[in-house]
């Protein structure tokens, strides 16, 4: 059976891992939630134990729903006497998008009408509505003409743990607090004897959640007490009581063993008072020290290692202050230099203001507020401090240098033949030196070489000292082989296959380097962002499209910085149209066009959601490039999931092909599966992935997949 666990945007992969650990047979991340395969007991366990989920929804029915009559009819078909007992109350939460029914409240009312009318026809008592505490809470998801009716097994939002009696201004939801703690590695740090510190603790959410996590307390125990979360007739009460009994045993053992290693402070005495009251209700007051202190007065905890968690002020109600973030970063480097930090900041600029080097960055949403979560490990490494190269290469560095020279020799003829100036020189060829090294050669001036180094996340089993040593050796080898100084080496940290943010700033050098590919000049920014503005793996596909675009109309969907458009224009395209929702990327595209003398009415830039734009557009194009993201959750457009939406997207794109036109579709989602039958209904499709991989990416040829479609 399949069910759905919803969560805040940005927590999907973390929640999927949690649900698998809780016993689900399969958990697949999607936008704002996880599709789960498991039994009802697994769903009920998630209600009791998930620290990250917002709701757990057990589906009752799914049907096509083009209008309100179809919604009513679909709900009325269900045997509601099997779901709702006589005398019990009802409530409906509705979420609608991309449908003829535009008002969620109206949709909820139609569902209530259908349930009430069905039970009346069966001669049963009319159920009453209780919005706050219903016996049965239903959930409607109505998206693009497809309705799913589910039981909310938790009876409401799961972030409500039941201990919050008092709060300071702008409280952090408990499930988001759990994510900050998990990303910071708090469970492992506690097991290793480390401490937990929040120097701006407010009403104590992060610390209380951390204490309950350390004590192995199920989040749902205090929320439900001796009650059941739902009086849905299908709810397995016997299984629930077994789960609760097991959780109480673990609770008793965990609380008894809870160590006093948690420290919280805040400059506001009212906030500290609220934090103490909340900790008392949660039953962890003895484990947490709270005190009134300004950030700069922070004192070194007795634990040698641990995790700093913090949610500094940033929203409209609490004025953001870059100086405060700078003071926070300086204080942490002075007081707990060897600790780890997990900081939920208002945005990337505020994260940068801390002055800390973020090894990992994640994009999260605190309600409607987009935030940047940075993880620093350890705190004491400033972001702009260059790693010192040894005067002579160590044995390990010499191994890396030898492999780099071998790769350069291997690529020499290919680079000369194709005129390749930007390429991947190394990609974890030696597994213990796990990083990618990209070479960017300046196209103008003295044609200097820059290196872009992306460090992959090391397994937790490898000691941090070994990770740092190997990174130093790799950097030393790269600088020697390419004869570049440290200031021309951009170092980034990145996890393979994870959903971390690509858009957080790393440095604010604002240094633009001009490079050349397929005869086009391009602007790249190697230092300020995780991605540079040029995806090197798509080089051969861009070349193919440029050759085919001469004298023809070229369309670039999800255009990013417009490199494919620029190269098509340089090759002689009659016109180019570049579509992206981001004004920043469109500006970058415009600058790339201008750099090649191509600005003008022949080259259109469209700020729009690509799918919506396609479905409204009537013009035709000869060559179309479609390289969508895996997920997109912009506030300006509907949520996008490439696995779910690709047939609709490709259908709309193929409809814009001129006679004899060709569409190139690519994506880098490792688990993507093309719906061949769905696509075959409107296009001929051929996978061309091997032909779109150049020699420098053959080591990891699954970096992207590509298809050629014709009408």
From Swiss-Prot:
It holds the Pfam family RlmL_1st. It comes from the Bacteria. One of its GO terms (cellular component) is cytoplasm. Signal peptide: none annotated. Residues 42-153 form the THUMP domain. SMART domains: THUMP. Its main location: cytoplasm. Disulfide bonds: none annotated. One of its GO terms (molecular function) is RNA binding. The keyword Transmembrane helix does not apply. CDD domains: AdoMet_MTases (cd02440), THUMP_AdoMetMT (cd11715). It is found in: Cytoplasm. It is an enzyme of class 2 (transferase). Its EC number is 2.1.1.173, 2.1.1.264. Keywords: Cytoplasm, Methyltransferase, RNA-binding, rRNA processing, S-adenosyl-L-methionine, Transferase. It catalyses: guanosine(2445) in 23S rRNA + S-adenosyl-L-methionine = N(2)-methylguanosine(2445) in 23S rRNA + S-adenosyl-L-homocysteine + H(+); guanosine(2069) in 23S rRNA + S-adenosyl-L-methionine = N(2)-methylguanosine(2069) in 23S rRNA + S-adenosyl-L-homocysteine + H(+). Specifically methylates the guanine in position 2445 (m2G2445) and the guanine in position 2069 (m7G2069) of 23S rRNA. Belongs to the methyltransferase superfamily. RlmKL family. This is Ribosomal RNA large subunit methyltransferase K/L. It comes from Xanthomonas euvesicatoria pv. vesicatoria (strain 85-10). The lineage of its organism: Bacteria, Pseudomonadati, Pseudomonadota, Gammaproteobacteria, Lysobacterales.
């Amino acid at each position: 059976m399949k069910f759905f666990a919803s969560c805040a945007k940005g927590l999907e992969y973390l929640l999927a891992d949690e649900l698998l650990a809780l016993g689900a047979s399969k958990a697949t991340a999607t936008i704002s939630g996880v599709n789960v395969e498991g039994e009802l007991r697994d769903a009920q366990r998630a209600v009791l134990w998930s620290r990250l989920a917002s709701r757990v929804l057990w589906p009752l029915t799914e049907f096509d729903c083009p209008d309100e009559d179809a919604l009513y009819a679909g709900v009325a078909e269900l045997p509601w006497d099997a779901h709702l007992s006589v005398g019990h109350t009802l409530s409906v939460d509705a979420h609608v998008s991309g449908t003829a029914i535009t008002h969620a409240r109206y949709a909820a009312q139609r569902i209530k009408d259908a349930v009430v009318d069905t039970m009346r026809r069966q001669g049963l008592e009319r159920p009453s509505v209780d919005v706050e505490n219903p016996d049965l809470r239903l959930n409607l998801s109505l998206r693009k003409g497809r309705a799913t009716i589910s039981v909310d097994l938790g009876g409401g939002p799961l972030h409500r743990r039941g201990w919050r009696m008092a709060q300071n201004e702008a409280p952090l939801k408990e499930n988001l607090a759990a994510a900050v703690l998990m990303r910071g590695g708090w469970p492992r740090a506690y097991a290793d004897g480390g401490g937990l510190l929040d120097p701006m603790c407010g009403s104590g959410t992060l610390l209380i959640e951390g204490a309950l996590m350390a004590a192995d307390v199920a989040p749902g125990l205090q929320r439900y007490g001796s009650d059941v979360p739902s009086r849905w007739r299908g709810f397995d009460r016997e299984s629930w009581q077994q789960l609760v009994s097991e959780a109480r045993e673990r609770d008793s053992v965990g609380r008894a063993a809870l160590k006093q290693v948690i420290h919280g402070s805040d400059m506001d005495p009212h906030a500290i008072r609220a934090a103490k009251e909340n900790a008392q209700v949660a039953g962890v007051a003895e484990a947490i020290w709270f005190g009134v202190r300004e950030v700069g007065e922070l004192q070194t905890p007795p634990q040698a290692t641990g995790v700093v968690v913090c949610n500094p002020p940033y929203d409209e109600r609490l004025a953001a202050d870059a100086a405060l973030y700078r003071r926070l970063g300086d204080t942490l480097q002075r007081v707990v230099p060897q600790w780890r930090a997990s900081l939920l900041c208002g945005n990337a600029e505020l994260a940068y203001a801390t002055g800390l080097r973020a090894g990992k960055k994640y994009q999260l949403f605190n309600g409607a507020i987009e935030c940047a979560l940075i993880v620093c490990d350890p705190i004491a490494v400033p972001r702009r401090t260059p790693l010192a190269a040894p005067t002579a290469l160590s044995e390990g560095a010499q191994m890396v240098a030898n492999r780099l020279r071998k790769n350069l020799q291997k690529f020499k003829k290919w680079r000369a033949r194709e005129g390749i100036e930007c390429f991947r020189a190394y990609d974890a060829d030696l597994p213990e030196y796990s990083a990618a090294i990209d070479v960017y050669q300046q196209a103008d001036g003295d044609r200097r070489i820059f290196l872009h180094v992306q460090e992959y996340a090391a397994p937790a089993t490898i000691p941090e000292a070994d990770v740092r040593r190997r990174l130093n050796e790799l950097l030393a080898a790269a600088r020697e082989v390419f004869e570049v100084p440290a200031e021309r080496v951009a170092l980034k940290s990145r996890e393979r296959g994870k959903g971390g943010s690509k858009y957080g700033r790393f440095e604010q050098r604002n240094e633009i380097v001009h490079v050349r590919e397929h005869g086009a000049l391009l602007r790249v920014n190697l230092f300020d962002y995780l991605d540079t503005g040029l995806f090197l793996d798509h080089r051969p596909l861009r070349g193919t499209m440029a050759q085919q675009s001469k004298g023809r109309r070229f369309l670039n969907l999800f255009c990013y910085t417009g490199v494919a458009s620029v190269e098509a224009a340089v090759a002689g395209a009659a016109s180019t149209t570049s579509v992206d929702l981001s004004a920043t990327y469109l500006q970058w595209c415009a600058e790339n066009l201008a750099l090649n003398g191509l600005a003008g009415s022949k080259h259109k830039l469209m700020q729009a959601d690509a799918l919506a734009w396609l479905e409204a557009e009537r013009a035709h194009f000869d060559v179309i490039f479609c390289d969508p993201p895996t997920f997109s959750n912009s506030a300006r457009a509907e949520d996008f999931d490439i696995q779910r939406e690709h047939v609709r997207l490709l259908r709309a794109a193929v409809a814009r092909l001129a006679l004899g036109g060709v569409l190139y579709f690519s994506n880098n989602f490792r688990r993507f599966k093309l719906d061949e039958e769905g696509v075959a209904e409107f296009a001929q499709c051929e996978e061309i992935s091997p032909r779109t991989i150049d020699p420098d990416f053959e080591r990891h040829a699954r970096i992207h997949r590509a298809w050629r479609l014709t009408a």
